[in-house]
Amino acid sequence: MLKNIKTYNPLSDYNKVIKKLNNNGVRPTKQRMVLTKLLFEKGKRHVSAEDLYTELRKEDRRISLATVYNTLKQFTKLGIIKEVVVDQNKSLYCNNNKSHYHLYIEDEGKVVDIPTENINLDLPAFPACLNLHNVDVIVRVRTLKDIIKN
């Protein structure tokens, strides 16, 4: 007998994005929907604006790099994706909207999701006038071979 197997349904994410755009007064233009498809059709991932632009070019889509950046910025502001700043010159965009942290493997330039229950955080008490909005954690590691070289 088969147990419940969770399968990834990119159409679900696609429909959620359309709804979120409409709820925030943002038109789901063809360009936004092409980028949405690209962001979500391959499952959970971390991708740069340049990587998305390259994927668009391979599909012969005519969307400028500036439009890619603007759309990613807008999607981040709306909470559709998260920006993961891995260094001062590079951001990756995460399409996993469940609460989680990130592991950044510096020498590989790779980001991996870490479930929140795998990291314990002790946060200070906040004044009553403040409300905790979000906690971003990026754990930075290097592979042992990279450490030995340095």
Task: List each model region and its residues.
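Intrinsically disordered, low-complexity serine/threonine- and proline-rich regulatory segments
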Residues: 1-41
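Non-DNA-binding regulatory cores of transcription-related proteins
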Residues: 77-150
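A short acidic, leucine-rich amphipathic alpha-helix
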Residues: 51-56, 68
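Basic amphipathic alpha-helical segments that dock to polyanions
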Residues: 68-78
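Short capping segments at the starts of secondary-structure elements
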Residues: 42-48
